[in-house]
Each structure stands twice: as structure tokens, then as C-alpha cells.
């Protein structure tokens, strides 16, 4: 049986509210966002900084209920600045024959990290460059 690593879910365009160098590592996310993104505490996540272009892997920890904080902790705090927009992505292993039917979940948040929309990932990129034809 062959497995493929596939995107499970992502929190799209979250705003970093804090960077704490003195904490042991991780990214702090509200329990509400973790739940809708199907990310468990201590689960590995990739963080892609839209603002700075940096990428790193860490693990999620649960923040305070009702909080809108996104706090990058430990050494990774060097890679973000409060106000940066990030994508927080989780992955799963799926049997190859099940990959075609797989639909990752995208959690959209507003500028204050409040839930805006949840939907399956849509395949396809809209080009911003006009077709020269």
C-alpha cells in the first residue's frame, strides 16, 4: 500500500499577534480555530509567512478559549513580526487510491483572526497576468 502526504487543512491569512522568543516553541492558536481546522494540540504544522516569505515547521498548542491570538513561540519567533499574515497548514497520510477524492479544508479568518468561512480547497490558481493572446 502506498501513501501520499496530502494537505489536510489550513488556516488562511491569519495575523500574527505575538512572537515570544522565551517560550519553548510552538504556535499558539485558539481552541475554536484548532477545532474547525481539525488540528490537534501538539500536531505538527507548517507556517508560511505571506508577509516575509519565511517558512517553518512547528507544532500547535491550544490558546485561551475565545482568544484571537496567533502567537509564534521559541526560535521561530525570529521568523515573524506581529502583524505578519501567515498560512498555518496541517498534513495527513492518505492511501494513494483515496487521494483523488480527498478535499482539504480551508479556514478563512478576518484581519482579527475571527472565523470568516470554512470550505474545501478549490483546485486552480487564478492568474493575475493577462493572457497575451
UniProtKB/Swiss-Prot annotation:
<comment type="subunit">
    <text>Heterooctamer of four alpha and four beta subunits.</text>
</comment>
<comment type="similarity">
    <text>Belongs to the PanD family.</text>
</comment>
<keyword id="KW-0704">Schiff base</keyword>
<feature type="active site" description="Schiff-base intermediate with substrate; via pyruvic acid">
    <location>
        <position position="26"/>
    </location>
</feature>
<feature type="modified residue" description="Pyruvic acid (Ser)">
    <location>
        <position position="26"/>
    </location>
</feature>
<dbReference type="GO" id="GO:0006523">
    <property type="term" value="P:alanine biosynthetic process"/>
</dbReference>
<dbReference type="InterPro" id="IPR003190">
    <property type="entry name" value="Asp_decarbox"/>
</dbReference>
<keyword id="KW-0963">Cytoplasm</keyword>
<feature type="active site" description="Proton donor">
    <location>
        <position position="59"/>
    </location>
</feature>
<dbReference type="GO" id="GO:0004068">
    <property type="term" value="F:aspartate 1-decarboxylase activity"/>
</dbReference>
<comment type="function">
    <text>Catalyzes the pyruvoyl-dependent decarboxylation of aspartate to produce beta-alanine.</text>
</comment>
<dbReference type="Pfam" id="PF02261">
    <property type="entry name" value="Asp_decarbox"/>
</dbReference>
<feature type="binding site">
    <location>
        <position position="58"/>
    </location>
    <ligand>
        <name>substrate</name>
    </ligand>
</feature>
<keyword id="KW-0670">Pyruvate</keyword>
<keyword id="KW-0210">Decarboxylase</keyword>
<comment type="pathway">
    <text>Cofactor biosynthesis; (R)-pantothenate biosynthesis; beta-alanine from L-aspartate: step 1/1.</text>
</comment>
<dbReference type="GO" id="GO:0005829">
    <property type="term" value="C:cytosol"/>
</dbReference>
<keyword id="KW-0068">Autocatalytic cleavage</keyword>
<keyword id="KW-0566">Pantothenate biosynthesis</keyword>
<dbReference type="GO" id="GO:0015940">
    <property type="term" value="P:pantothenate biosynthetic process"/>
</dbReference>
<protein>
    <recommendedName>
        <fullName>Aspartate 1-decarboxylase</fullName>
        <ecNumber>4.1.1.11</ecNumber>
    </recommendedName>
</protein>
<feature type="binding site">
    <location>
        <begin position="74"/>
        <end position="76"/>
    </location>
    <ligand>
        <name>substrate</name>
    </ligand>
</feature>
<keyword id="KW-0865">Zymogen</keyword>
<keyword id="KW-0456">Lyase</keyword>
<dbReference type="InterPro" id="IPR009010">
    <property type="entry name" value="Asp_de-COase-like_dom_sf"/>
</dbReference>
